[in-house]
């Protein structure tokens, strides 16, 4: 992977379908991503298939998820919970950065360029290996429209 320094922040630009790894102010890696099936707008409630927008933290790593590795985003925040509960809804949770479904087999190509998740941020398995290696728990993530 080379000497790229410590990853200080992850930035997602939903409109561009890009995830950037930053070391200080410098972008050291960027990836094409897939989002939730309803990509526009902030996640409001469980089941809306949206990817949240805002500032969060990467707070947990799961090597044994239903998808190829996953790193959890600290959604919902207190504000997210308050917003959903005002409508009498659950904000949802378990929003992750992850690879492809574990059972995808030869169909991996079918996911490329599509927004197919329930709100998570997906990359290829090879890219997930790299992100897994470079990004520590506690790293801030900003998800922009």
Model-derived features with residue positions:
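Exported/periplasmic cell-wall-interacting domains
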Residues: 60-145
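Well-ordered beta-strand positions in beta-sheet-rich domains
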Residues: 30-32, 55, 94, 140
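N-terminal post-signal-peptidase region of extra-cytosolic proteins
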Residues: 1-9, 14-15, 35-59, 79-83, ...
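Short glycine- and Lys/Arg-enriched binding-loop motifs that mark or flank ligand-binding interfaces
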Residues: 32, 43, 50, 95, ...
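A short, polar/charged loop/turn motif at coil->beta-strand junctions and beta-hairpin connectors
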Residues: 6, 27, 52, 65-67, ...
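Short Gly/aromatic-enriched secondary-structure transition segments
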Residues: 26-38
């Amino acid at each position: 992977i080379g000497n790229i320094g410590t990853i200080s922040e992850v930035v997602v630009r939903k409109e561009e379908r890009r995830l950037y790894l930053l070391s200080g102010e410098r972008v050291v890696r960027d990836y094409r991503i897939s989002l939730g099936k309803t990509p526009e707008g902030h996640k409001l409630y469980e089941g809306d298939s949206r990817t949240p927008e805002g500032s969060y933290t990467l707070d947990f790593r799961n090597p044994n998820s239903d998808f190829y590795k996953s790193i959890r985003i600290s959604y919902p925040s207190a504000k997210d919970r308050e917003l959903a509960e005002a409508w009498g809804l659950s904000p949802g949770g378990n929003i992750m950065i992850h690879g492809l479904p574990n059972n995808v087999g030869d169909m991996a190509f079918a996911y490329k360029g599509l927004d197919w998740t329930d709100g998570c941020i997906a990359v290829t398995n090879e890219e997930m290996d790299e992100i897994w290696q470079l990004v520590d728990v506690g790293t801030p993530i900003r998800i922009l429209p």
